[in-house]
Amino acid sequence: MRCVPVFIILLLLASPAASDPLEKRIQSDLIRAALEDADTKNDPRILEDIVSTALATCCKFQFLNFCCNEK
């Protein structure tokens, strides 16, 4: 007799709730937007920008001797 309420509660927890149509549409829009963002390509010059910024910082604070050209 005690197992019946537990079984009903577990069944209710496991069953998917009826989703709101607006919520379902928002979720599908977010998934589509995420897939479109995943397809975008990075600018090939981004690596050059990162390296030049790192070298400028290295030269400014003189962390390493070999990163700057001695004049």
From Swiss-Prot:
Keyword match Ribonucleoprotein: no
UniProt-annotated location(s): Secreted
Pfam families to which the protein is assigned, alphabetical: Chi-conotoxin
Domain of life: Eukaryota
Tissue expression summary: Expressed by the venom duct.
Keywords assigned: Amidation, Disulfide bond, Secreted, Signal, Toxin
Propeptide: 20-56
PTM field: Contains 2 disulfide bonds that can be either 'C1-C3, C2-C4' or 'C1-C4, C2-C3', since these disulfide connectivities have been observed for conotoxins with cysteine framework V (for examples, see AC P0DQQ7 and AC P81755).
Molecular function GO terms recorded: toxin activity
A GO CC term attached to the entry: extracellular region
Signal peptide location: 1-19
The UniProt record lists the keyword Translocase: no
SS bond list: none
Entry domain remark: The cysteine framework is V (CC-CC).
Similarity section: Belongs to the conotoxin T superfamily.
Name of protein: Conotoxin Ca5.1
